[in-house]
């Protein structure tokens, strides 16, 4: 039976670039992958055709030979009759396409390093500014304490793979070419576990929860990340463990807002204090301190208290506390208070008194000029 053209199998033109071929391969491989078509022999056969076409058309030498001689270029040694061995190496195929998803890859595979873990830690502003030590509990994979990560039953050892003789690779003949592929027997590790550990069933790792004490340095902020080396999941078969990353999130504070190493807060004062000046108490993270408010203070004025902010997590200068004054309009006035305010307003020369309310005069002068310009 004549073999189908490789370009037709992938649905690309004979002038297709490599990226087009890879894109077509990914789409078709996902569609016909055996895991998605279990028990479907036609899909498995189609999948093998797709792999065969892909391996030829993405190799410049093989593609040139195929374009010149067609399938005859690979008949000696036979792609179809043993060139790829009995059955497709699915993990190796998807090592090219999806990387770590299926764990494939060329050549002997080293035991995989343990996965990194992430823990989201919420802190109060006070904890973030001063630093704190917290205990956390995380689910993870730890090295099996029976086989000590080897995966083999105590008293036994992993055996050298008889197919690849420990290299993790097998050589396949494809017409004019000899190529190396991941050993399908040991999946590239070079060893096999004949007598698996009864506790971890040959994986070398077991699921556990562990408690860690995490020291948070003073000055951290939302988005900062603390790395605990080697506290991630244990690696496979004795490989190094991954790391644990603690992601910091600082809760909103009822009084202070943080911007870099500076803190901001709003301080309400009554209009008499704003006009006459005086002394008030304002909060800081270290307690209350006194602040002198000069007379004629307007809403929005910022008072800087140096060194009352946050010390940089990287060392160096400490930030400041900036207090923004908000002048409050009095509410709930009794008749006497209203009368006094009325007399005060009259003493100003009305609502827009020029001398006592310079900003009001400036505003209304601007409004008058605006309308005068419109009527010209």
From Swiss-Prot:
Name of the gene encoding the protein in the UniProt record: dnaJ
Functional description taken from the UniProt entry: Participates actively in the response to hyperosmotic and heat shock by preventing the aggregation of stress-denatured proteins and by disaggregating proteins, also in an autonomous, DnaK-independent fashion. Unfolded proteins bind initially to DnaJ; upon interaction with the DnaJ-bound protein, DnaK hydrolyzes its bound ATP, resulting in the formation of a stable complex. GrpE releases ADP from DnaK; ATP binding to DnaK triggers the release of the substrate protein, thus completing the reaction cycle.
Domain (J): residue spans on this chain: 5-70
Source taxon at top rank: Bacteria
Name of the protein in its database record: Chaperone protein DnaJ
Gene3D superfamilies: DnaJ domain (1.10.287.110), Heat shock protein DnaJ, cysteine-rich domain (2.10.230.10), Urease metallochaperone UreE, N-terminal domain (2.60.260.20)
Domain notes: The J domain is necessary and sufficient to stimulate DnaK ATPase activity. Zinc center 1 plays an important role in the autonomous, DnaK-independent chaperone activity of DnaJ. Zinc center 2 is essential for interaction with DnaK and for DnaJ activity.
Origin species: Shigella flexneri serotype 5b (strain 8401)
InterPro entries per the UniProt record, alphabetical: DnaJ (IPR012724), DnaJ_C (IPR002939), DnaJ_domain (IPR001623), DnaJ_domain_CS (IPR018253), HSP40/DnaJ_pept-bd (IPR008971), HSP_DnaJ_Cys-rich_dom (IPR001305), HSP_DnaJ_Cys-rich_dom_sf (IPR036410), J_dom_sf (IPR036869)
């Amino acid at each position: 039976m004549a073999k189908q053209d490789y370009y037709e199998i992938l649905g690309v033109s004979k002038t297709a670039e490599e990226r087009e071929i890879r894109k077509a391969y990914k789409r078709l491989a996902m569609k016909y992958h055996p895991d998605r078509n279990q028990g479907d022999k036609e899909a498995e056969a189609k999948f093998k055709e797709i792999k065969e076409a892909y391996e030829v058309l993405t190799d410049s030498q093989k593609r040139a030979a195929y374009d010149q001689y067609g399938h005859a270029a690979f008949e000696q040694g036979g792609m179809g009759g043993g060139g790829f061995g009995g059955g497709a190496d699915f993990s190796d195929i998807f090592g090219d396409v999806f990387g770590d998803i299926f764990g494939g890859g060329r050549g002997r595979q080293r035991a995989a390093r343990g996965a990194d873990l992430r823990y989201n830690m919420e802190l109060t502003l006070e904890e973030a500014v001063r630093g704190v030590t917290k205990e956390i509990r995380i689910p993870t994979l730890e090295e099996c304490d029976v086989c000590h990560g080897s995966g083999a039953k105590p008293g036994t050892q992993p055996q050298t793979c008889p197919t690849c003789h420990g290299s993790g690779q097998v050589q396949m003949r494809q017409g004019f070419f000899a190529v190396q592929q991941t050993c399908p027997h040991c999946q590239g590790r070079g060893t096999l576990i004949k007598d698996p550990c009864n506790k971890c069933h040959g994986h070398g790792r077991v699921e556990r929860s562990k408690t860690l004490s995490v020291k948070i340095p003073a000055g951290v902020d939302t988005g900062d990340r603390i790395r605990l080396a080697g506290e991630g999941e244990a690696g496979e078969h004795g490989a190094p463990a991954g790391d644990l990353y603690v992601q910091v999130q600082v809760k909103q504070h009822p009084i202070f807002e943080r911007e870099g190493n500076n803190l901001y807060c709003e301080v309400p004062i009554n209009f008499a204090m704003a006009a006459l000046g005086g002394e008030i108490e304002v909060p800081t993270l270290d307690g209350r301190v006194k602040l002198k408010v000069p007379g004629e203070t307007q809403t929005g004025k910022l008072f800087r208290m140096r060194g009352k902010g946050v010390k940089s997590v990287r060392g160096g200068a400490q930030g400041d506390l900036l207090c923004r004054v908000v002048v409050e309009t009095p509410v709930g006035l009794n008749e006497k208070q209203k009368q006094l305010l009325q007399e005060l307003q009259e003493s100003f020369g009305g609502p827009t008194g020029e001398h006592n309310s310079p900003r009001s005069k400036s505003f209304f002068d601007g409004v008058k000029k605006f309308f005068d310009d419109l009527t010209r």
